[in-house]
Amino acid sequence: MAERVKILKPGLTNRSRSASIDMIVMDEIAKNNPIYTNDNSNNNNNDETSSNISGSNSIQNLSLNNLNNLSGGGGGSNSNSVNNTISERNPDSPRFRSNTGNLQTMMMVSNGNIIGSIQSPSPPISPRAQMTAPNLSKFLDQHTPPPSPKPEHLSGHLRIQQQHHSGIYRNLSFSSVNSSTSFGDFKRSTNLFQPPQSQSQQQQQLQLQQQQQQSMPNLSLGNNINSNNNNNNGSENNDISMEIKDNTSGIDTSVKSFSPRKKRKKENKIIRRIRRWMTWVISSNIWLTIMIISIIFVLFIDDIIGASGSPSSNAIDYSIMAVKCSIIGFFSIDIILNLFCFQQEYFPGTIVFWLDLISLISIVTDIHHFQNYYANLVLSITVNTRIIRICGSFIRISLISTLYNRFLRKQTLPSEGLEVEASKLGDKLIRLTTNKIVLLALAVLFATQLLVYESDTPTQYIQSTISSFEYLSSTYGLQSPEFTGVFNNYQLNNEKLLFTQISNQKIFNLPDKINSLQERSILKYNYLNSIIWIDNSYYIKYSCILHLCLTVFVILVLITINLLIVNDAHWLVINPLENVLTIVKLLSKQNSMIKQGGGGSGIVGGFSNNTINSNSNLNSNSNLNSNSNSNLVRNRVESIGNKSDTADTTSSSGIDNEEPDEADFLLGMLNEIDDSLQAAKEKVEEESIQNSILKKDIEDLYVEKYILQVHLRSIVRKINFHDPIGHYLKNRQLLLMQSNATFNTLEQDSEDDIRFKLNDDGLPDLNVIQYATIDKLIEKLTMAEAHDLKFANVFLLTYRKFLSPVELMERLTIRFCVTPTMELPEKLLASKEQVEQWRKTKQEQIRTSVFNTIKLWIGIYNWDFYENPDLYELFNNLVNKIMPFCKMEKHATYIDSIHKRKMATYIQDPPYIPIEPLTQEEIAETMVLEDRLLFNFDISDIAIQITLMEFDLFKNIKSKEFLNLAWTHKTEKTRLSPNIVRFIEHFNSVSFWLQTCIVKSGKIKERVAVLKKVIALADVFVQLNNYYGAMEVLSSLESSAVSRLHKTWEQVPQSSIQSLQSLQKLLSPQENFKNYRERISKCGSCCIPYIGLYLSDLTFIHEGNPDYYQQSQLINFSKLREVAITINTIKQFQNIFYYYEKNQNIRSQMNFKSPGADIIWKMSLSCEQRNK
């Protein structure tokens, strides 16, 4: 019966586990344990796994008994090592061409029959029952092997014999993880774990090997058995693919290799050789030395020139340009070679390539400046070029890693206790960390390089000096003693003067010194027809010295940091995995040694069952294997630390089908640990959820405490126990009691609380509120769905008629502190999902809306916070206590900063001072003295100055002064609306002053001239969009004292009459000032509106609309909206300023004093008597 030996692929690593330990364990087993499957129908030992593992070369703590004891008649013994290693092979890869197949096996051929001398599997150890989690630490302490020695330290244990072919030798410790090799790259040696052999045993072994080679002509396999005089067999595992066939006995045994890696696309040999050669060139010491010298030259040469005093000569300039051109060529070649050798690893995905390219291009700017006869000293003055070049050069600091690896890196010693050296992980750490450090340092350097030191001689001072010289030369002449004395004095005080030309004539010149300096080190000042050149090399020298020091300092810092990073990365140890890896390697090695015997028995047993008829040899062999296995079991129990009694439970044949594999046990143990961790994680997550819920409940209790505090303060303040907050809270509780188990029950709008404006279709427009209670208005102000900015502006401007600022802050605080118990009925409170959903969808949005409302309140309508300690206390509690507790520290800090900034910039309005009436002497003086202001200055200049005065008064008017008809109160108007009162008084003063100027002239001709000036003044006011001033003029001309002067009006020119008629048409009150409203609606520039019209509109809105809807608690919000629209119309003109200069000469003569309406009337009568 034919049997087939199959080599299976390693088991796939479970990559779905949360921890990376399983990945490394499975990778270690996959690398070290090729799995064999033995099909044996006679002994029913199918699918038995035999592992051949070769891990670290350590031989300590692994004392195993002799395997495969054999004698001619059963009495002799011999020790041999079985090492069946099958590795994957890729014939196209040059890595495997030098390796030949090698299969070491111990077989004896007698009378054409093959007898296997391999031990049967060992009895069960049951490690799963004995080595559990509690004694795992004890096991680690007892059986952790020492670090793996390197090949150079194993001269006493291993001697590697050189074969006729060359192989790639790699240490099998975990330091080889970073090499990208297949299984066939590793040179395994399990003979290290064997005890020393005696001389007789060695001779018997050699005889057996010779018999084996002579008696197996039909077996096609590659045997390469190496032995040495030190009783250690160094076996070399090479990549083989073999097929064993025995036609005479009917045996067909095939061995299949691992599936090779996916082949790379074949590359042309010439191109590969060229790439290798180029890689060797750019990695050579000479190339690196040239690169470092080039970078140093580019970085420092220009600063050195500047620090040397900016010397200039053809030799210096051309030599430096030649070197820089050479560096450009060298850098270009370096970039091309890197592109060819590293391809995608260098371009285009890395920043190194682009900065190298920019650095290369930046050197071209030097040549460009030089060819255009500019200075060579570009880096010392041109900051941008310096920064680009430093960035491109400093990014090459990665050379430090190469230099370290080549000259400074030390080999890892066994005494260091490292199980994992720097590998791809370390290299990646170097690259990532180095790039971040370099970019950070370059960012700092970028900022510091902006510090360019200029000359301390101001340009304005030099130009002033040149102007003085030109004035002296034009006045006295260049040869005059006045000019000569001043110039000589200037020359003595300015030793850096190089060249002077005044009025196109050279006065002073130092050509030798000018030619010896760089062009940019000479400051050239031109003004009109004069030129002055000044030597600036001293300041350039100072700047270059500072730049040199800074550059050297940054380079030293980068070198030091990179050396530390590289050094640490090359000594990297994965400490958390040391113990696990030790367990894996120890158990897998012992499992490999035992399974070699079991697997060999299966293979050879298959041969014997089909080729021999005698069972005596098999029985004797079974007894020998049983005795050997007994000793091996004891050694394993002692080495692992297990004290199981199951060693006596073996069957008569010495085979235990239920023995667990140590690797399987380890994986099972890891699974159990993972299950325990998963259960613990779930428990922690559950407790975290519970803690989160409790934390939210504590937060609710905390904010509800502030609600009660606000309520208590409100009750104390309201002596008559008018309790709006308590009424609001009580209504909320009643609604909760009446609500159904729906989520938005409390947010439904009732006509008893709010009414909306009807649209054209007769349906309510939910965006326009017409009537609502104060509680509903507060809810709409802080809606969770969206923050209505228009509504907020209207409310915050007009709410004071129904709420005080303190009450509004209390309501907003309560709204911010809203909790599920205040908004959700009991049925929904019982559901954690509903509560959490409400917190996410409602509570957070409501708090954000309250934050936006307070931010708008403080930012625009902040006059409520001035001198109001109660309001400040509430605001301070909200910002410093409640909001931080609710995890809104950033929001609290933001609005607190706005509040502090507004308080710091607050300027209190000056107290109102009423205009004192004129005394009798002042009245007499006004009537007698002639006022020539309208004739002494241009009428446009007078109009501009009056406009500027009126705009200053207009822009000082606050929005709150328009509320509740404050300017109409008889006793409180000067306190509530002081700026409006001042503006109105100014209107009357100007109007009376113009009337006085007209009627105080005794002659008609003089009065006509004054009337023409006054009408012209009105025209200029209209051109300036000063309709307030235009109305002042119109009211003075239409006054009874001026309009009655018929004889005077008859002599006014027709052009002035037409201008007056045009002004009267514009400001006509017909159709509610239709013409004026149309004109001002089109005004897009600075403007002073006629404020009397808007005061009339506010009066009409206030008196024509009720505050409440039909004696209910519904506030007429439409009225508030109309008031806000009118006020905002006025306020929009305050934000556009007039950009004219004040004329103090005109303002000093503006004295808007008038004797009063009665005296003006009498003066008018004296000008023209009444008609009888």
Swiss-Prot record:
Transmembrane spans: 286-306, 320-340, 347-367, 378-400, 432-452, 545-565
Recorded GO CC terms: plasma membrane
Composition-biased stretches (Low complexity): 34-70, 78-87, 194-241
Annotated SMART domains: RasGEF, RasGEFN
Region annotation (Disordered) ranges: 34-100, 138-162, 186-246
Keyword Membrane part of the UniProt annotation: yes
Recorded name of the encoding gene: gefW
Name of the featured protein: Ras guanine nucleotide exchange factor W
Annotated coiled-coil segments of the chain: 666-702
GO biological process annotation, one example: Ras protein signal transduction
Biological function: Promotes the exchange of Ras-bound GDP by GTP.
Domain N-terminal Ras-GEF: 765-903
Principal cellular location given in the protein's record: membrane
